[in-house]
Amino acid sequence: MQLKTVPANDVFGALNLMTEVIDRKVAGFISPAEVNGIAPEVKGLPESVTNTALIIESSGSTGVPKRIALSLEAMLFSAQASASRLGGHGQWLLALPVNFIAGANVLFRSVIADTQPVLMNTQLPFTVEAFVRGASLMSDGRRYTSLVPAQLTKLAQAAEQDAFVFSMLRKFDAILVGGQLPNWDDVLELRSRGINIVVSYGMTETCGGCVYDGVPFDGVSVTTDSGLIEISGPLLANGLGESFVTNDLGEIVDGKLEVLGRADRVIVSGGLKLSLDHFEKRALELPGVDELTAVALTSEFGQSVGVVYVGSPEVNFLELSTSISKAAKPKALLRVSELPKLSSGKPDLVRIQQMLEASL
């Protein structure tokens, strides 16, 4: 089958591509966006593929993105399982780039649902105003959107001050948040005010989220193998076999999956182990912290924590060295107005690492 490429900034073209993919006319690859009308150089793609609906690049937050082939059967299973869990198909508001799995799913599921998605310009930085404007254009049926935690934080802060923003969020039947561990203060606060925040866990290799609020889709099995999360089911990417052992740490508690963080984000400092994802979760609970990313800094004396955050200059991060462990004392700390992010909306860990190393 021919592989057709569409740039991410051509969202209508990408939406039409999904229709062709579902009709089994072509396979699709959504490339990074054009810059000044010039398409990015894309190397290594085949002209044709077999048993493939979409080739999707992973976010590449820690390095070079991987290209992952997904079959139409896997994508259809994921779309139907998601709709079943959410209470039915509906209209989607696109707030994420379409060349990554979460944004691509919005388009794919819109075609499956036979609904017209409302399309934000995801090539521009996310703003509450643009989101609310998009939400106001949605129909009266079931409403969904998919966000990353940083976007949800901005909406949560705005909803505290602006009744109209809050009312627009209440109109969504579900707001999915995924891509990384969420800020649980935001999730719990919005839920307490009647907004249905669904915490999604998955990755490109699983056609996106396959666990909602700790519960796997029907037909999907999630277990832990030596602490690593293992997923099996009909939505796995081509070539993975019957199960996929992720690089994420987790545990099953009362029948629900709790994601603890990435296995490659555990440092050893002074003989003490520290999960950077756990550090971030606890640091986000500190008063005055809006957004935060932690990375490992390595020297001849071992590893330590480096932190870049958005928030008050008065935040006391030293609290964490007593409440978590001595390893949680940051070696480097930078306060910024905006976290460096990839086009996927995830933190740019490589850039953040460079900033912190340059500050030492």
Where are these predicted regions, by residue range?
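Hydrophobic alpha-helical segments in the ANL/AMP-binding
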Residues: 10-24, 82-83, 101-114
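AMP-binding/adenylate-forming
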Residues: 70-77, 91-154
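Gly/Ser/Thr-rich phosphate-binding loop
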Residues: 157-213
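AMP-binding/adenylate-forming core of the ANL superfamily
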Residues: 221-245, 249-250, 256, 310
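AMP-binding/adenylate-forming catalytic core of the ANL superfamily
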Residues: 247-328
